[in-house]
Amino acid sequence: MYKRPRFNRVLLKLSGEVLMGPGQFGIDPATVARVADEIRAAREAGYQLCIVVGGGNIFRGLAATARGIERSSADYMGMLATVMNAIAVQNALENLGVDTRVQSAIPMPTVCEPFIRRRAERHMEKGRVVIFAAGTGNPFFTTDSGAALRAAEMKCDALFKGTSVDGVYDADPKKVKEARRYDCVSFNRVLADDLKVMDASATALCRDNNIPIVVFNIREQGNFSRVLKGDGVSTIVCNEEE
């Protein structure tokens, strides 16, 4: 049976959709402020935090490819969207007094720092929140893969994926009323059953580096801090299974 360890350094993966709140597109300032307050509370509780943000609220590379934009170009456009989201989250955190740095995998020195692993580690050791933008910096990789990569590089204890559902289910809970939520599920089952936690390459990277993935509902007020302490509703994806 899986025994959950004490997490100290964690990476929070936020989808772009979380940042658009009740809207259908773009950034909702009230939602970003609420998410920032969740992050502030976790930081004040003593956790070292880094964040990866998606860009789907602004631009979706795969959807654009289907409409005729060349795949690499579409992916780069999506990476730039994540930088916009990262700056929005940084602004919201700094409004709350949280010292924050944005590092981009695509260098843009007038906007933010380039990604430098050792510098990012020093920021976190000094109590700063680090937001990683532009995914891996390469086309054909999702921001989920970018999150898994950064979690491994930063030696994070876990990757927390904030979504609009409270965990991983054996079927789509929006379509199947009897769908069962897992408290704990193995990486291999997620991959074999295609449970859609993250894309396969991100899941495999976390498995190979023994980084648990914690899936939880970021839209519920105060839930991030509860799940960090082991009190909230979530699913843990790990190398063991209940």
Swiss-Prot record:
NCBIfam families: pyrH_bact. It catalyses: UMP + ATP = UDP + ADP. It comes from the Bacteria. It is an enzyme of class 2 (transferase). It is found in: Cytoplasm. InterPro entries: AceGlu_kinase-like_sf (IPR036393), Asp/Glu/Uridylate_kinase (IPR001048), Uridylate_kinase (IPR011817), Uridylate_kinase_bac (IPR015963). GO terms for molecular function: ATP binding; UMP kinase activity. It comes from Zymomonas mobilis subsp. mobilis (strain ATCC 31821 / ZM4 / CP4). Homohexamer. This is Uridylate kinase. GO terms for cellular component: cytoplasm.
